Amino acid sequence: MHRTYSLRNQRAPTAAELQAPPPPPSSTKSKFFGKASIASSFRKNAAGNFGPELARKLSQLVKTEKGVLRAMEVVASERREAAKQLSLWGADNDDDVSDVTDKLGVLIYELGELQDQFIDKYDQYRVTLKSIRNIEASVQPSRDRKEKITDEIAHLKYKDPQSTKIPVLEQELVRAEAESLVAEAQLSNITREKLKAAYSYMFDSLRELSEKFALIAGYGKALLELLDDSPVTPGEARPAYDGYEASRQIIMDAESALESWTLDMAAVKPTLSFHQTVDDVYEDEDGEEEEEPEIQNGDIPGQVVEEEEVEWTTEVPVDDEAHEADHHVSQNGHTSGSENI
């Protein structure tokens, strides 16, 4: 992970990073204007400097995500162009290379198409974030009004404590606080609702894209198996290529797998090390309590079953005093025996 648990704290390098340092930065990264374009940086800074103060941070996030979308559009377009170039290059090679590169171009072009579809779904996440920003912007005036009235009251109490405007302003402050409470409650509710919906859009679309990318990668590896990469000596001819039907079938299988994929078929399932809700904890505990009476002696592997000792007594009339004496002697003998042990 880029950071440990939080983006707000620097983290120490892991043992794996110390043992195998990451590769140097790509030579295609910008060295003069930073990691973002000038236009993207300008839009983000402008969003953080203008508009209602409450909505500025979220405005910066929305503008940043717009830059992400534009970057993904470029990636999707360039990937499709790269797929075409791969197919054109392979056409001038031997039959096996020509066929495999042509089919690989089909798969790589599909990667660009999937990214293009992902952009449309990703934009729904950004639009939902904008609705939170709009609510924050609408709440800001009520906050400003309440603060303004509070400042006026404090100023009058300091300058002219007997002013007749103070009671009027206090009544206005009560109304402003009531309006602010309603607006703050709406902001709290809508923020949680829209935040959950927005990132559900994003993670569902990201999950779909990742799973489909993994499918295409698997079929791409299958295509590579059709290439005979065994070395040949000078003058030796390679065996004739007969993988046309196999490569065609691989593409058909890939298309069928992508069309039939649904979110329920996702292969990667998250595993959590804690209970999701309190009800889960109580359900597990209740289940354990219900199962406990059903366990009998000998049901648990490795359990030692102790036989019940049965005391055989004969009904012989005994004198009460003699019985008490015998009972006292048996208790003393038991105590001394336990001490010896």
Swiss-Prot record:
Phosphorylated by PKH1 and PKH2. Phosphorylation is stimulated by sphingolipid long chain bases (LCBs). It is found in: Cytoplasm, Cell cortex. Transmembrane segments: none annotated. Residues 1-11, 330-341 have a biased composition (Polar residues). The modification Phosphothreonine is found at residue 233. Pfam families: Pil1. GO terms for cellular component: cell periphery; cytoplasm; eisosome; eisosome filament; mitochondrial outer membrane; mitochondrion; plasma membrane. Residues 282-294, 305-323 have a biased composition (Acidic residues). Keywords: Cytoplasm, Glycoprotein, Phosphoprotein. It comes from the Eukaryota. Residues 1-32, 282-341 are annotated as: Disordered. Together with PIL1, main component of eisosomes, structures at the cell periphery underneath the plasma membrane that mark the site of endocytosis. Negative regulator of cell wall integrity (CWI) in unstressed cells, probably by inhibiting protein kinase PKH1/PHK2 activity and regulating their downstream CWI pathways PKC1-MAP kinase pathway and protein kinase YPK1 pathway. Activity may be regulated by the transient increase of sphingolipid long chain bases (LCBs) during heat stress. Present with 104485 molecules/cell in log phase SD medium. This is Sphingolipid long chain base-responsive protein LSP1. The gene is LSP1.
